[in-house]
Amino acid sequence: FQSREAMEYFLAHVCTSEWNEEQDGGRPIREAESLLLDQFPHYKSEILAFYGRWTEMLGGPIHGTVDILQGLKEKKQHGLYALTNWSAETWPKTEERFAFLSWFDGILVSGKENMKKPDVRIYRAICDRYGLEPASTLFIDDNHRNIEAAQRLGLQTIHFASPAQMETELNIILAQ
């Protein structure tokens, strides 16, 4: 992009968060790109670069959370499962990049399930797949809509704001 403003315009009006979330829900990337190319042909190279250069856009892990995850894994007292809104097509690249994802006992990727958080069915799916009892399962997420949906199913929750806040709340829950 020629400027930060041009990039922000593109992300706000062309490859929007809402558009990206549809791929997290299972829509194939080629189909998603075609929809935008029909509407915005003058942005062809940028639209194709959105997923074509996906790994360049990935941020790094939140290190404090990775440290907490590692501590939980080492204690071996609780099963660790991940429920992520992510495209099935970009997930393999993400797994390759972040070794800590292998520490989970199971991962449910929304794009593979054709549904995404906060759809309550995806919380049921992870509980059913891994034999988790909602009342004794803790769900941590940074999105309040996702927290509310998990609570409707009866999961315990922590609304993530920072690693320190999460660790404090986690220690309180685990001490009960």
Feature map (PLM): residue ranges:
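N-terminal helical cap/lid subdomain that shapes the substrate entry/recognition surface
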Residues: 1-67, 87-90
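Residue-level marker of regulatory loop/turn positions in helix-turn-helix DNA-binding domains and
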Residues: 61, 83, 115
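Asp-based, Mg2+/Mn2+-dependent phosphohydrolase catalytic module
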Residues: 87-88, 92-176
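Generic beta-sheet signal
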Residues: 80-81, 137
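Catalytic-core regions built around general acid/base machinery
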Residues: 64-77, 103
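Secondary-structure boundary motif
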Residues: 38, 42, 71-77, 96, ...
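A generic structural motif
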Residues: 76-79, 155
